[in-house]
């Protein structure tokens, strides 16, 4: 039974495991996660591959948590050049240990590269979640991501006769003792404040001997400490687009958003519509959403999506194979979840090298800029209505290829693909939906319409039986135990992606 209280004043704790993937890999190697230079990345790919994580000691050198591997190499090359000049001689050794590098200024900074192991990280995350469950009921824990949770600690503080800080540190110490992984925590009077305390305030306070940082905020201290904080993108749910639109009106802090909500509230609603309400609440440190509401939430409509960044630039024909594979996979996913959808959306992202090829130079369409300011042909987007709810691989595959052929510029090279299924509902809900009335006319042969529908339904039933058989085989013998001829075509990626979780090695 949940210990959730009905009192108005609540206490929330957010806990974020520090550089989780990198910390797991350090601990597995008997290394200190806080003093070891380590990146989690598949170096078998190109240096453009995204690092799944970097250790805290590398972050201290200005390397972002989701850097590309070449950015790590480039930054360390710059730092090592500075170290070599300071030493006044060539390096006499190298190390990935911060402690050793401090003792030997004439050594080169090195780092460990760990291959991603997603299934291993998931097991570690589950183990840590079970540690939280020793203290908190599952109804009062919201798993935000593989390495982050929200906890409604309101009713547990009196039971344990602890402050929120004491309860947080007790759980974090237990996680550290059993896994070797440390954490950062935020405490607040609502879910927004505990998140911001963790993300912003905790980063600016000294860590204890185990690297633990815990910060606390209420509405008053939030306004006092963070109303003038910059940049706005440090705040939860404020992305670059929102910050950019606000900056056009001279608004670059939460304090200015709060003041604007008093005198020019209509401006915020003009810019962001209904989302302005959330932005205004957060500017004042308010958050009406409780743990109880989070747990009770069920979306009326949902979607399923699949996306991938290709390992190299693909031609139109090669990428078409991948689109077919993705459509087949998403249809099987719908069958497995006993769901159906009636709309598909396709997004095609082009490679920047497209503009340098002989055919690409002919391109005169719209361009955008990547994160490095380089010109890239603008993404292509398209959607199609299926005119019926379905999980058929055939119907979904045929429809998405029509969209692909229609929206894709055949002259350009392709780097990114994503497919979304919209208006996803359960098969049970579909059965409850009443059939729409048909407007009869004198020129339609309804017997022929009925006959065609019966034939199509029979064909779809046969396909459904085949899909369920495929799923049973894959569940028992592995995803690659049954492959289509398509999966062996040039450019096919399904066989390799079946060995991955979230685009990284399982």
Regions found by a protein language model. Give the residues of each.
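DNA-contacting surface of Y-family translesion DNA polymerases
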Residues: 14, 234, 240, 244-414, ...
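C-terminal hydrophobic structural anchor segments
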Residues: 402, 406-465, 471-472
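Gly/Gly-Pro- and Ser/Thr-rich, intrinsically disordered tail segments characteristic of DNA damage-repair
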Residues: 1-282, 287-291, 442, 447-506
